[in-house]
Amino acid sequence: AGFNMWPGPYGNFSSKKTLVNALDGSLKRMGLDYVDIYYSHRFDPNTSLEETAEALDEIVRSGKALYIGISNYNAAQTAEIIKYFKELHTPFVVNQASYNMLNRGIEEDGLLDTLSQNNKALVAYGPLAEGLLTDKYLDGMGDDVKIHWSNEFVIKHGKDELVKKLNELNDIAKNRNQNLAQMSLAWLLHDPTVVSVVTGASKINHLEDNLKALNNLDFTSDELAQIDKIVKE
């Protein structure tokens, strides 16, 4: 819950009424008694984090969810709600955030460190930057290419500069016997705080190809330094 679930009052964000009603509706539609993980998918500027935490805790105590997650909460918001979860002994396990080799916002914000220090996990969504971190654009990007708002900043120096960076990253991937997508996923998963990635595939062979990232999750310090230099320059 967190984004629009229905029109009108309490149809989005993370108040107690919204969280409870949204889950009840989802369980009914799915024909289930409970979910494994229930996410507050968006920080609510009009609801205290204490209320959100207490609502999520009650949902677990009522047997409707086994674990709790949050999504799109920054480092400060995450640290504060973790404090409430600890007081309540709520089984909070994960924050889901936009993160990929090009999009380092959560590193700069301190979210990765906050989760690591509290022994909590990160699930990365947009791990391939909506297709940018694949072989799709190695030969160039047309004017009709649309980039998700969360990654728009990566073309601040122009599409040609981005294509140059993608090819430089691809050269590192080839030296690792991986393609760019596989290395991008492996780069995320080599961090012990990152327990999973949310990636889609329109074809089975795309999924099978992505899974090969698991064959090599180890990076040398030189590889990591080269990647950082390319991305951050």
What is each of the regions a protein language model found here?
Residues N12, I37-R42, L66-I68, G142:
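Short N-terminal helix-initiation segments at or just after the protein's N-terminus
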Residues A1-F3, Y34, G126, A201:
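Short, small-residue-rich loop/turn micro-motifs
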Residues T47-K232:
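Beta/alpha (TIM)-barrel catalytic core signal, keyed to glycine-rich beta->alpha loops juxtaposed to Asp/Glu
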Residues L27-S48:
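Active-site groove signature of glycoside hydrolases
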Residues F3-V20, H41-T47:
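Active-site mouth loops of central-metabolism enzymes
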Residues A1-P7, Q96-Y99:
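A short, structured active-site edge motif that brings together acidic residues
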Residues N12-M30, T78-I82:
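Short, acidic/polar
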Residues P7-Y10, Y39, W149-K156:
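Short glycine/proline- and acidic residue-enriched helix-loop micro-motifs
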